[in-house]
Amino acid sequence: MILFKQATYFISLFATVSCGCLTQLYENAFFRGGDVASMYTPNAQYCQMRCTFHPRCLLFSFLPASSINDMEKRFGCFLKDSVTGTLPKVHRTGAVSGHSLKQCGHQISACHRDIYKGVDMRGVNFNVSKVSSVEECQKRCTSNIRCQFFSYATQTFHKAEYRNNCLLKYSPGGTPTAIKVLSNVESGFSLKPCALSEIGCHMNIFQHLAFSDVDVARVLTPDAFVCRTICTYHPNCLFFTFYTNVWKIESQRNVCLLKTSESGTPSSSTPQENTISGYSLLTCKRTLPEPCHSKIYPGVDFGGEELNVTFVKGVNVCQETCTKMIRCQFFTYSLLPEDCKEEKCKCFLRLSMDGSPTRIAYGTQGSSGYSLRLCNTGDNSVCTTKTSTRIVGGTNSSWGEWPWQVSLQVKLTAQRHLCGGSLIGHQWVLTAAHCFDGLPLQDVWRIYSGILNLSDITKDTPFSQIKEIIIHQNYKVSEGNHDIALIKLQAPLNYTEFQKPICLPSKGDTSTIYTNCWVTGWGFSKEKGEIQNILQKVNIPLVTNEECQKRYQDYKITQRMVCAGYKEGGKDACKGDSGGPLVCKHNGMWRLVGITSWGEGCARREQPGVYTKVAEYMDWILEKTQSSDGKAQMQSPA
């Protein structure tokens, strides 16, 4: 009988990778050796997903029901590690093997929508109800805070009293404790990892408060935000308590306790200095954080098993080196004199059994962080390269199509959308300076990100507040020059599928010929119109500055501007789109080329829109967004 290690690990968010994305599945092949965990999964794809999120798994092998006579080994999923990144393959009829997708960017997802017919996924049955379809059963599971997977007996199930029964289930490891072939039964998983739960979530972090109840895991993390992300992707964590690095008990400092309860909420909480508590974000709708953490922690050392030590120039290069190395989970970059040669210093690449540091030390001459290979972008830049494919003549956008787009709203006696903007970093938004004409007070502004429909915004919708408005020093009201401003948010944003930064162009990027450009916003659909509810998009060609100058003979079109529009008109940005993005796709990457600034009317014939040219302001953007430790806080692929 095979021994399955249920719940002896939890999903790590900062896992190792091999170099390059390998998606090939090997039929009739089984990897020999290297086992780090085993479980039951309904197919090879789900087994691969579990491998992708496991801290040590690089390879997997799966045994379908048809591949083996031993009932206890059917649907067996074996997760494997290897120092070299590969293992010997042996022939096994029906077996399927493959690689982790940690290195595969946008293919990284914990969402699994498939329905499996003719199988019963076993676990702890905690809720039974009558429903009319398997889809309704899956929806109930998704809307139940404890449900991980389900089974549904169809109308043709052999026992009439069980027909249309929907069984909600969970297990210690989040996967079935057994899978049995059973006619007229359909099974599947909760869609909470798809950000489709209707439960709602608590995004607040509670300072100096400790939650009670059952601990399901304990890890070391540098801050409460890493703790929360780990909780979000742990199969049984519903809330957490984090003990800071100044907690009174030294052995408990930086401990992140992942917790659960029967009710789904803490049964009690206790005021405690230097503790921080919060909730899993798995039940958030459309706002799940990415399963990675990009922040670098200066003055901090991460301890763990040593993989390699190499000399590199700068902490960012150290993080990139960790990200590219086959098994690196986290790193420390040392600035000790004895660890440096000329301009390069030692980069310590490390790993652990659970993907988290085994020790965290403060007040050092090092900087530490995590591998970025579970970031969905799939490259060293956090800014996104993905979309699905004041807008006049535009069409409706879809969820996640333009994840950098934000709505700048003003709340005085009433609240209204005023301008657009572009997310360029965890704490930075780029927009037009003229949006703040007459409204320079930061307290009246609310920044909404990760939204599609303005009508979805209610008094309970989370928003960002402004910490600082930075308007270009040469901007003058009622003039079109230097129409650019930065917004620093009071708190950093988590990146999600619907909320990611746009890449910035290279400094002085004037030679690139862009042919696939889009403008987005909620602005008027005609000159004398009204704000649109659904985010609009329009594909629009760039116009040379020489041609643009001919159309605006009473104005000066400078090299710091870029124009776009159709000669015949009909499609353009308009009122309410100001500050929003003009983005262009080049070599597979979206870049913020312009900021919606001004124009003569909206979509008029031979009157192109004028945009602030972002490439001409890269020095200014870098200067203003540079942090105290010298790490740029916006996202640029250059």
Curated annotation (Swiss-Prot):
Inhibited by SERPINA5. InterPro entries: Apple, Pan_app, Peptidase_S1_PA, Peptidase_S1_PA_chymotrypsin, Peptidase_S1A, Trypsin_dom, TRYPSIN_HIS, TRYPSIN_SER. Residues 391-626 form the Peptidase S1 domain. Residues 21-104, 111-194, 201-284, 292-375 form the Apple domain. SUPFAM superfamilies: Trypsin-like serine proteases. Glycans are attached at N127, N308, N396, N453, N494. It is found in: Secreted. It is linked to Prekallikrein deficiency: An autosomal recessive condition characterized by a clotting defect due to prolongation of activated partial thromboplastin time. Affected individuals are clinically asymptomatic. GO terms for biological process: blood coagulation; Factor XII activation; fibrinolysis; plasminogen activation; positive regulation of fibrinolysis; proteolysis; zymogen activation. It comes from Homo sapiens. It comes from the Eukaryota. PROSITE patterns: APPLE, PAN, TRYPSIN_DOM, TRYPSIN_HIS, TRYPSIN_SER. Participates in the surface-dependent activation of blood coagulation. Activates, in a reciprocal reaction, coagulation factor XII/F12 after binding to negatively charged surfaces. Releases bradykinin from HMW kininogen and may also play a role in the renin-angiotensin system by converting prorenin into renin. It catalyses: Cleaves selectively Arg-|-Xaa and Lys-|-Xaa bonds, including Lys-|-Arg and Arg-|-Ser bonds in (human) kininogen to release bradykinin. The active site is at H434, D483, S578. Belongs to the peptidase S1 family. Plasma kallikrein subfamily. Found in plasma (at protein level). Forms a heterodimer with SERPINA5. The zymogen is activated by factor XIIa, which cleaves the molecule into a light chain, which contains the active site, and a heavy chain, which associates with HMW kininogen. These chains are linked by one or more disulfide bonds. Interacts with iripin-3, a serine protease inhibitor from Ixodes ricinus saliva. Interacts with iripin-1, a serine protease inhibitor from Ixodes ricinus saliva. GO terms for cellular component: extracellular exosome; extracellular region; extracellular space; plasma membrane. Changing G123R: In PKKD; uncertain significance. Its EC number is 3.4.21.34. Disulfide bonds join C21-C104, C47-C77, C51-C57, C111-C194, C137-C166, C141-C147, C201-C284, C227-C256, C231-C237, C292-C375, C318-C347, C322-C328, C340-C345, C383-C503, C419-C435, C517-C584, C548-C563, C574-C602. This is Plasma kallikrein. Keywords: Blood coagulation, Disease variant, Disulfide bond, Fibrinolysis, Glycoprotein, Hemostasis, Hydrolase, Inflammatory response, Protease, Repeat, Secreted, Serine protease, Signal, Zymogen. GO terms for molecular function: serine-type endopeptidase activity. Residues 1-19 form the signal peptide. The lineage of its organism: Eukaryota, Metazoa, Chordata, Craniata, Vertebrata.
